Amino acid sequence: MSIALPKNSAKMKDWSWDNYVPFFDYLEDLDLSSSNVDEWMKYWSDLSELIGEVGTSVYISTTVDTTDEEAKARYHKFLEEISENVSSRNQKLKIKFLESGFSPDNFDIPLRGMKSEVGLFSEKNLPLLTSDAKLSKEYDAIIGSQTVRWEGEEVTLTQLSPVMLKTDRKNREKAWKMAAKRRLEDRQSINEIWIKILKTRMSIAKNSGYGDYRAWRWEYLKRFDYTPEDCLTFHRSIEKVIVPLADKLLKNRKEALGLEKLKPWDLSVDIYGREPLSPFKDAGE
């Protein structure tokens, strides 16, 4: 008799790891057979979906307000107490399934991915992957806190970007330089985070037996149908065919705007001198 899963993830948002354990124990203890493997897989899939919804919810809370320390703490708690344990238990379930020899119909592609995940897994990487996720959120917090004073109001750099669509070139230049200056203020902090991320990712690759992070990431993303060399070939094709076309388009833009030199703040404005459309001002409208 299976343990009934919650009807939705809302009930699970404040769960500790102990609340999750019985569901994984049930999946791990059940003897697989040709008659129950489909049901077992569905139960596992439904459980994973619920956990994913919880993770998405706590993650989104950190993006709504990057300065919300409570949301940050909930996200970190989920990563450390739930996500790491889920990954470890899922590894055992994947091995159990693969060793059973059973497979649902039309499962060839997911099966290939599962085999890849099992080979990629390293218990040592669980805290490192958590650290990587935390560092990424530190970066998001820095970017989210970048604001400037524009026309008497404090605005984010994203809120400033519509100025780039307006026909007043001096204003566009002022806004662009203001945003660039603000970004440069965080250069050192961002570089420090990047160095930490780089070291963390190099360790992740090493723990899984890969010579570099790109090779590890390639397998992690399940890019089975093309290689890094294929991408480099594609890059060279872009350089040969698309870059000259892009240069031509920029030249046409410069001429259409009647400029001697095209600047970064000239790349979004309408080339015919039309003001940007304003379909609405707020959600109510």
Locations of the language-model features?
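Amphipathic alpha-helical domain-onset/packing element
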Residues: A283-E285
